[in-house]
Amino acid sequence: VGEIKLDCGRIVGLTGYARSGKDTFARILVDEFHFKRVAFADALKSDLASYLGISRTRLDTEKEALRRALQLRGASLRAVDPTYWIRLAMSSIKYYQGAGCNVVVTDVRFPNEAVALRNMGAVILRMRRADQPLVTEDADTSERSIDMIDPDEVVLAD
């Protein structure tokens, strides 16, 4: 993992467009380096499953079909409280840090998420594929805001 120190309690935040390799990179950190995985969207997925009356497993297996519903639900609660999802994720991160674990956050999409993680000492990595299409004007806010995050390093995921 390059020059990133893997001592106890380390936090790595991953940012990048959809299908840029964030989950694949996180899986390597979890499987090979024993990181604990956290996502800002974990609580959102549980919330949406409850709201729609479906299983959480269904959200994970039908990810593409339900992506827009996740985006809308996340945005609606973020409009009321911009730190809502951040506070929920921070609880998990602090728990793992307290247990001496390294943590990878797989879905840093908004600048305030990156700031919150950096305030905890995180390094932010931007995942990029060489063939990654540019984000279009009609892309969701969560995709467009990724470009406002200044990463510590860019990882080419090919």
List the model feature ranges, each with a label.
Residues 40-102:
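ATP-dependent small-molecule kinase phosphotransfer cores
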Residues 22:
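Conserved lysine of the Walker
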Residues 88, 112-120, 126-158:
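Small-molecule kinase domains that catalyze NTP-dependent phosphoryl transfer to phosphate-bearing small molecules
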Residues 25:
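Hydrophobic positions on the alpha1 helix immediately C-terminal to the Walker A/P-loop
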Residues 1-12:
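Extreme N-terminal, non-catalytic leader segments
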Residues 17:
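P-loop (Walker A) phosphate-binding loop of NTP-binding proteins
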Residues 30-38:
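Post-Walker A helix-loop "phosphate-sensing" segment adjacent to the P-loop in P-loop NTPases
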Residues 14, 105:
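Hydrophobic anchor at the beta1->P-loop junction of P-loop NTPases
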